Amino acid sequence: MKEVRLHLRTALCEVLWESGVRMQCFVHATEPAGWFRFENLSDTLVPLLEMPRYHAGFGGRDGEDVPGSSLQRLGYPPAELIHTCRSVTATQEGWGGLVYRVHVAWEEPEQGTLEGAWSIDASLPGDPREPDAAAVVAPALGRGFQADLETHHRWWQESWDRSSISLPDKIPERQYWCRPGW
């Protein structure tokens, strides 16, 4: 990895690798979806969805940095994963009958570029509907990465235009407003 930048003003993360591959990602300001875009890919990239391990019985490190903090202690069943050639859906049962679903779908709009959207939806027992994150992702893909990025940026621009700060000491206030990227 060569560089990672989080643009606070636009809530966009960019990652640049030594190979020239560039990734942009954001969680939309007003839509319940997130986006990722990889550019300058020299080979096919297939996104991988790795769910939290809420259960025992798998190989490898469990990620427990603090004794007793492992998610395995929750004992939830493994997530059900459904893969297609351009999407993956995970359904996870949790405490009290909670069910959440993560859906990720992607496309290759041009050679060397991969764009994808994702969403998470949940339901509790008695909810009239099943969680359907795919119902959020499909229209997002229909709108496209660039269109959603523009509405996302517009929302953040309007938010910053309505924002202000006033500090009793004018020197830190000036430093706040003169920060790069603001």
Question: What are these model-derived regions, one by one?
Answer:
Residues M1-W182:
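Acidic/polar, glycine-enriched structural segments that form the non-catalytic walls/loops
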